[in-house]
Amino acid sequence: MCQLKSCLVLKDRVFCPDYNSHQQMLEELGIEDDYLHASKTFVRVEFTPPDNTKSLIEPLDRWTLEVDQDIVPEWWDKKADRQRVEEAVEIWRKRHVFTGGKHIVTTGTVYAYGDAEVHAYNDATVAAYDSTIVKAYGNAKVYAFGKTTVETVSNVPVEAYGDATVKAYGNTKVEAFDRAIVKAYSNAKVEANGSATVKAFNSATVKAHGNAKVEAFDIAIVKAFDIATVKAYNRAMVIYPEERKIIYPAGWTIETHE
């Protein structure tokens, strides 16, 4: 299964790394994944919160412990070993689950709730909920839910849901759903779905679906589908593929757009 949060229970400790792949855990520890070792050395477990990642801050006694293998060693005691798993996951949670304060992450996956503020760099991934603030740079990835506010620079991909607000710069790619609000600048690319609202500036590119609303400025380009609404200003261009129609900016000529 390898769900969050996966651990490997050994007789003398619980291995609970940043990742959730049991196979990767066994390889890191140099343990063969075979019947002999499964019956004597390790137990794969999944320790999951009641509502997946939305409830990572719930008390650990509400989480569910599942064994992810058919045979277990004789020393395995689900009640006693659950306590060991809880202790290991609590240590992991303190490092990866934020409910307040300002945090800087450069690698791995973290989860932000409440009024936490996260600055993500390099290959870090942030899943943000509630009213959290995320500023992402480099190759970081952001998944925004609730009323999260995200500011992205460079190649950061963002998926925005609920009432999330995103400001995207550089070559950022944004997928917006529900009532998410996006402001896109530079060469940012946005796909807007549901009732998402987008304001596109500079050379931003937008694909709008459903009831999405887009305001396009400068030389932004918008492709509009379904009943999406677009207001275009300056030299922005709107393309309606389903209607085979293009609305050119005022003063547009072949010479000025070659």
Predicted segment positions?
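Short, glycine-biased loop/turn motifs at secondary-structure junctions and
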Residues: 1-258
